[in-house]
């Protein structure tokens, strides 16, 4: 299980991304539409002035149950360990053990 502080840090980042999403998108759109290089530089400075954690690339996908950052399946939002345990316990509908 991941430390609670790390899970809390990721939740905080998600909230910052939601808070600054519209501002960030509007600045990026203005950068694309800017014609002069000086105007682009000024807009880029505005973008850099936003908090670092407000960028969506800073968010890390984590397992909902354990908080594990690696081997997380997007379809379930769970790590491979939890998926295996839940599949063996018949808690995931439609998931069957493969055999060939």
Swiss-Prot record:
Location within or outside the cell: Plastid, Chloroplast
Gene Ontology BP, a term: translation
Assigned keywords, A-Z: Chloroplast, Plastid, Ribonucleoprotein, Ribosomal protein, RNA-binding, rRNA-binding
Keyword Iron attached: no
Source organism superkingdom: Eukaryota
GO molecular function: rRNA binding; structural constituent of ribosome
Gene Ontology terms: cellular component: chloroplast; small ribosomal subunit
InterPro entries reported for this sequence: Ribosomal_uS14, Ribosomal_uS14_bac/plastid, Ribosomal_uS14_CS
Gene3D superfamilies: 1.10.287.1480
Record's function text: Binds 16S rRNA, required for the assembly of 30S particles.
Known partners and oligomeric status: Part of the 30S ribosomal subunit.
Family membership: Belongs to the universal ribosomal protein uS14 family.
Name by which UniProt lists this protein: Small ribosomal subunit protein uS14c
Organism: Chaetosphaeridium globosum
């Amino acid at each position: 299980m991941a430390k609670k502080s790390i899970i809390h840090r990721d939740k905080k980042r998600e909230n910052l991304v939601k808070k600054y999403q519209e501002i960030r998108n509007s600045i990026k759109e203005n950068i694309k539409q800017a014609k002069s290089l000086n105007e682009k530089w000024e807009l880029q400075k505005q973008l850099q002035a936003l908090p670092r954690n407000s960028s969506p690339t800073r968010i890390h996908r984590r397992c909902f149950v354990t908080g594990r950052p690696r081997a997380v399946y997007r379809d379930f939002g769970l790590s491979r360990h939890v998926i295996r345990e839940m599949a063996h316990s018949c808690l995931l509908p439609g998931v069957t053990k493969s055999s060939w």
